[in-house]
Amino acid sequence: MSSSQFKQLEKLGNGTYATVYKGLNKSTGVYVALKEVKLDSEEGTPSTAIREISLMKELKHDNIVRLYDVIHTENKLTLVFEYMDNDLKKYMDSRTVGNAPRGLEMNLVKYFQWQLLEGLAFCHENKILHRDLKPQNLLITKRGQLKLGDFGLARAFGIPVNTFSSEVVTLWYRAPDVLMGSRTYSTSIDIWSCGCILAEMITGKPLFPGTNDEEQLKLIFDKMGTPNETTWPGVTSLPKYNPNFQQRLPKDLKAELQPYVKEPLDDNVIDLLHGLLQLNPDMRLSAKQALLHPWFSEYYES
């Protein structure tokens, strides 16, 4: 495939790594999203990026945005993705009344969360972490199908600390083990993000809206309790563990979330949230385990 096959239409935005355009495949008439990654002229394309991206082309699943092709020219890399017209952040923002956040109806929350976990379970089975899950990366079709976008890009290009784009690197969905400098993270970092996203779909507002690493941890410990060697063996040896963290007890999640929700919250969804938001990464559910949670029984029993 060459870039001449595509007609570049309007710019959709600047991401962390790339400028994104809507494009048209001239031969098929199908819309695509073109992500253009500028390459450093001296360094050329990092071979790891090419490797990671070719892995992504193999990820074919209903809940993962398809990467159709990669066009490699001298000074840029163009990733050709399927075009999606909405994302979870925009979708939730469009429902805000005045300035008041509004969560989604619980049956929709469940349907979106199920699809998020389905896509994630598939990636994790293929040994690929997302590393940067957030509502902006969850794309939605008009029929309510949810797909994970930007898969593997964090690994291919590194998560920049200061981005040149309008998109702040968001800490809100980042796991406490990563915030404390753990280098041995695994699929459990994505599970933490899933928990944050689930709570946000329920209430319409981010669960832990921190502005820096320190505040982010404080917000997490305020709600989930402060970890110690009993609840999380090894936590005190993490590089950014601070022995002066204020000791907090876990709050009642149901009581915290219920005021934002019209319908009474099901104990099952609170139980699932606890399973996703375990401070100790070894205690978090896997995506596969989460899909078998009783809250989803209507999906797997039918």
UniProtKB/Swiss-Prot annotation:
It comes from Candida glabrata (strain ATCC 2001 / BCRC 20586 / JCM 3761 / NBRC 0622 / NRRL Y-65 / CBS 138) (Yeast). Belongs to the protein kinase superfamily. CMGC Ser/Thr protein kinase family. CDC2/CDKX subfamily. Interacts with a number of cyclins. Residues 6-296 form the Protein kinase domain. When phosphate concentrations are high it phosphorylates the PHO4 transcription factor thus establishing repression. The gene is PHO85. It catalyses: L-seryl-[protein] + ATP = O-phospho-L-seryl-[protein] + ADP + H(+); L-threonyl-[protein] + ATP = O-phospho-L-threonyl-[protein] + ADP + H(+). The keyword Nucleotide-binding applies. InterPro entries: CDK, Kinase-like_dom_sf, Prot_kinase_dom, Protein_kinase_ATP_BS, Ser/Thr_kinase_AS. It holds the Pfam family Pkinase. Keywords: ATP-binding, Kinase, Nucleotide-binding, Serine/threonine-protein kinase, Transferase. It is an enzyme of class 2 (transferase). The active site is at D132 (proton acceptor). GO terms for biological process: DNA damage response; G1/S transition of mitotic cell cycle; lipid homeostasis; negative regulation of calcium-mediated signaling; negative regulation of glycogen biosynthetic process; negative regulation of macroautophagy; negative regulation of phosphate metabolic process; negative regulation of transcription by RNA polymerase II. Its EC number is 2.7.11.22. This is Negative regulator of the PHO system. One of its GO terms (cellular component) is cellular bud neck. GO terms for molecular function: ATP binding; cyclin-dependent protein serine/threonine kinase activity; protein serine kinase activity. ATP binds at L12, G13, N14, G15, T16, Y17, A18, T19, V20, K35. Signal peptide: none annotated.
